[in-house]
Amino acid sequence: MKQLACALVLILCGAGLHALAVQRPAPGGYIIEHDAAVAKNEPGTHNGGGQTIGYSFFSKVPKLGLVFRKRALKPGSGIGLHEQKEDEIYYVLSGTGTMTLDGKTVNVTPGTAVLTRTGSSHSLRQTGNDDLVILINYEAAEPQSR
């Protein structure tokens, strides 16, 4: 009987250790943000002109090394010509526009993804009647400890 009790204790201890070894996300291991909570009316960035709505998701998260934004460019607005300091990805969700990449102008439509590399230059202009809505993603120059 003593051997059975010892075996049972060992089994229970082993199960407890296994449970500790299984990786579980820490409480609060995710953050959810909605458009309405982060939306800000802003002029076209980089002196692009016109009006836009900027959505800076997770901008208050400490030490996050990633920037994730959405921007709605109103008719006639744009993102001005600027040199890229880090790789940056643009993805068009809706609307139409023209993007100038190192002096070459291309049309962008829903489903277009553009990677702009460090040292390149680009600008973006909304065309058509509907807002040009884009996602923008890049590595933060330095993770903020906001």
Q: For the regions a protein language model found, what residue spans apply to each?
A:
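Glycine- and acidic-residue-biased ligand/ion/polar-headgroup-sensing regions
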Residues: 85-88, 92-97, 102
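Conserved short histidine dyad/triad with adjacent acidic residue
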Residues: 67-84
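Ligand-binding loop in jelly-roll beta-barrel domains
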Residues: 62, 118-144
